[in-house]
């Protein structure tokens, strides 16, 4: 694996400097874009929320997506097992 280098990313108006390898860069950028999008989805509708509250609500929405995908994956595994 290559040596990490610095990557500046912006999430909800804040700049973060991360250390990533060239192999990780595209995935980190995609993750950053998704987190930023989810924070804007929450924060743009609720102007009275502070940054921390927006981050927590976005994290809850992202986790909900993750749990839904886990359930769907398990259902697909069950269907595949039944067809064997």
Outline where the language-model segments fall:
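N-terminal intrinsically disordered, cationic/polar leader segments
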Residues: 1-2, 6-8, 82-84
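C-terminal structural segments of small proteins and small subunits
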Residues: 60-84
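Generic detector of leucine side chains in alpha-helical contexts
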Residues: 7, 18, 49, 57, ...
């Amino acid at each position: 694996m290559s040596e990490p280098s610095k990557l500046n990313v912006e999430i909800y108006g804040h700049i973060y400097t991360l250390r990533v390898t060239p192999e990780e860069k595209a995935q980190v950028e995609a993750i950053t874009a998704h987190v930023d999008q989810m924070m804007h989805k929450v924060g743009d509708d609720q102007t009275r929320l502070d940054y921390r509250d927006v981050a927590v609500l976005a994290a809850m929405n992202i986790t909900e997506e993750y749990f839904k995908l886990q359930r769907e994956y398990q259902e697909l595994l069950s269907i595949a097992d039944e067809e064997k």
